[in-house]
Amino acid sequence: MSRQPILDIKGLRTVFRTRAREIVAVNDVDIVVNPGETVALVGESGSGKSVTSLSIMRLLARKVGFIDAGSIILRGKSGQTVDLAAIDEEAMRRIRGNDIGMVFQEPMTSLNPVYTIGDQIGEPLRVHRGTSRREALEAAVELLDRVGIPDARRRAGQYPHELSGGMRQRATIAMALICNPTLLIADEPTTALDVTIQAQILDLMQKLQSESGMGMLFVTHNLGVVAEIAQRVVVMYAGRIVESGPVKEVFRNPRHPYTMGLLRSMPRLGDATEMKRRGEKLNTIPGMVPGLANLPSGCAFAPRCSFAVEACHAAVPPLASVNKHHGSRCIRWQEIAA
C-alpha cells in the first residue's frame, strides 16, 4: 500500500463574511491523512472541527463561507492529485461521493425522507458511474448486508423514518462507501446514538476501513472514541491547531494546557462514586471558547489557562516541535506534564 498521503492540507484558512466584517473560522491548519490511517480532529464546540471538514468537502454556505488561503491536496482512486481548494464546483461534484465519502452526525438530516434507503444508497453509483437503477439497487442491498443491517433487501425498500437510529447511521455509512472512496470524513457520526450502538458503529467503520485501506478523518469531541479508533490526533481551539501527534503519545504526555484540560475532564469508570464520597467535583476547563469575532490577543486559550504568562497575550505562539511527530502551540510546552 502506498504511503503517499491521501489528504494533505497546508495552511488552510476559511473565512465567513458577515455584514460587519469577515470572520476567520479556520486559520493556518495543516492535516495529513495516510492510506489506512484514522486521524481524529477534536475540540470543544466552536473550535473549527466541522468547518474544517466542510471546507474539505467544499460544502460551505455559498457567498458566506469561502477558503481564503491554503491547499487541500487529495489523492484520488486514479492516483492523481488535485487541489480541492482550487477547482470549480463542477469538478468538485465529480469528487464528492466518489473519491471522498462523508458521514454526518444526524442521519435523519442527511437522508431524504421521500426516497427509499436503497435508492439513496445507490444514487452515487448512478451519478458517478452511470450504473443502471437495478444494478445500483443490487449494490445497495449487498452493502446494507455488509454494514450489518438484517433483511437488507426489505430494508432497502423502506424509508428513513421506518429504520431505527442505528440502522439509519449504518445506511448513511453505506451511502458514503458505495463508490469505494479513498477518504472518508466522519463528522461526529456516533454522537446521536446510545453507547451500545455507538460501539457497534465504531467497530463497523474500523472493519470497513481495514478491508478497503481508505483513510479516515474522524471529527469528534469524545476523547474516549479517539483512543479507540484513531492513530493520530489533531486538537483544535478557536480555529487553530494547538496540538497534534500520535494518539498514545499525546494522551500520555500532552504538551498543551488545552489538551491536558480535555483529558482531565474525561469521566472515568468509578470516578463519580469515589468523587461523591470525597466531596469532590468533576474537573472542568474554566470559561468558554471565545467567539471567533472577538478572539483575545495572543494565544486564544490564554484567558482560560493556568499556565498563562504575560508573553502569552502578546502574540499567537507558533506550532513548536516537541519531536518529529508531535507539535504544540504553547510557549511553555517544555514545562507542561500530565
UniProtKB/Swiss-Prot annotation:
First-level EC class: translocase
One MF term in the entry's GO annotations: ATP hydrolysis activity
Annotated keywords: ATP-binding, Cell inner membrane, Cell membrane, Membrane, Nucleotide-binding, Peptide transport, Protein transport, Translocase, Transport
Keyword Acyltransferase: no
One biological process term in Gene Ontology: peptide transport
Membrane topology of the entry: Peripheral membrane protein
InterPro entries per record: AAA+_ATPase (IPR003593), ABC_Ni/Peptide_Import (IPR050388), ABC_transporter-like_ATP-bd (IPR003439), ABC_transporter-like_CS (IPR017871), Oligopep_ABC_C (IPR013563), P-loop_NTPase (IPR027417)
SUPFAM superfamilies: P-loop containing nucleoside triphosphate hydrolases
Binding site for ATP: G43, E44, S45, G46, S47, G48, K49, S50
PROSITE patterns (UniProt xref): ABC_TRANSPORTER_1, ABC_TRANSPORTER_2
CDD domains for the chain: ABC_NikE_OppD_transporters
Domain ABC transporter: 10-263
Function: Probably part of an ABC transporter complex that could be involved in peptide import. Probably responsible for energy coupling to the transport system.
Subunit structure, as described in the record: The complex is composed of two ATP-binding proteins (BMEII0863 and BMEII0864), two transmembrane proteins (BMEII0860 and BMEII0861) and a solute-binding protein (BMEII0859).
Family matches, as NCBIfam families: oligo_HPY
Family per record: Belongs to the ABC transporter superfamily.
Name recorded for this polypeptide: Putative peptide import ATP-binding protein BMEII0863
